[in-house]
Amino acid sequence: MEKQYRVLLYYKYVKIDEPEEFTAQHLKFCKELGLLGRILISEEGINGTVSGTVEQTEQYMNALKADPRFADMPIKIDEADGHAFRKMFVRHKKELVTLRLEDDVDPNVTTGKHLKPKDFYEQMQDPDTIVIDARNDYEYDLGHFRGAVRPDIEAFRELPDWIEEHKDMLEGKKILTYCTGGVRCEKFSGWLLKKGFEDVSQLDGGIVTYGKDPEVKGQMWDGQCYVFDERISVPVNRVEHVIIGKDYFTGEPCERYVNCANPACNKKMICTPENEYKYMRSCSHECRTNERNMYVKEHDMTQEEINERLALIEKEDHAAID
């Protein structure tokens, strides 16, 4: 049975005059349609993901295609049971993806070769190839291509510095890079070329497109793909499912992300429902005892209940040491 909602994912590097004015107009239009989602607009283009009914998303796509700037923009479509967002944001930003380079990269001028899923799949298996995940560490930890390098970064803007520190491992290699939908790799692969790396390619359409390819069927992907909406993750490999995520507290296989209940921390943790309960969705003792702990507020916990939970954790910690 066809689902009644869809999630759209798209981007286009294209010059947008008066982006702040276009941002306000686009927000109004999206709200009128009843869409929910997050869209970034800058002078260098548009990068968005929205959810809505089939009818709403169809109207939205038709409007985008009617604009000469976005007429040839690929739009990835996922069926959904309902909205994947809670609100509608359209924001103006200086960059579509934040790299803060002194010498900025224009992907329309300099970017890596685009590889279709089958070509990417075959190139990954070349022993002279190195595959770099251009996403954040918490995205990698939930799922990644088999054998891909995990840059130790918490934000995309940290990636160039990480590459500079590890450039020896890339010397003489064919470089493949990938991200969720492709927007980050457009700039990152261009930056690699500017830094003198000669053989640089990127996964055309990103992980999302790779998982939908009827021939490759997501093979050589392990785990789930992290997405920035209420779904949190989506499947990729349609041939075999290998769980690589590990529970933050116990290390057991898990693919469920939560955020630390201390708003000042908000650390992303892979965590089972049982351990979310046991540890009050908090990454540390300091976060569990923080006066602003959201888990405590959500469950209306009394101080007695909090103390009982803390005592149990302390008892088990001592037992583990002994």
Curated annotation (Swiss-Prot):
Q: Which residues form the Rhodanese domain?
A: 125-219
MF terms per GO, please? oxidoreductase activity, acting on paired donors, with incorporation or reduction of molecular oxygen
Q: What is the lineage of its organism?
A: Bacteria, Bacillati, Bacillota, Bacilli, Bacillales
Name the chemical reaction catalysed here: uridine(34) in tRNA + AH2 + O2 = 5-hydroxyuridine(34) in tRNA + A + H2O
Name the encoding gene, please. trhO
Gene3D superfamilies annotated for this entry? 3.30.70.100, Rhodanese-like domain
Under the heading HAMAP family, the entry gives: TrhO
Q: What is its EC number?
A: 1.14.-.-
Active site, UniProt feature: 179
Q: State the InterPro entries in the record.
A: Rhodanese-like_dom (IPR001763), Rhodanese-like_dom_sf (IPR036873), Rhodanese_C (IPR022111), TrhO (IPR020936), TRHO_N (IPR040503)
Q: What is this protein called?
A: tRNA uridine(34) hydroxylase
Gene Ontology annotations of biological process type: tRNA modification
Per its UniProt entry, which superkingdom is the organism in? Bacteria
Q: Which UniProt keywords apply?
A: Oxidoreductase, tRNA processing
Q: What does this protein do?
A: Catalyzes oxygen-dependent 5-hydroxyuridine (ho5U) modification at position 34 in tRNAs.
EC class, as a word, reads oxidoreductase
- Give the family this protein belongs to, as stated in its UniProt record: Belongs to the TrhO family.
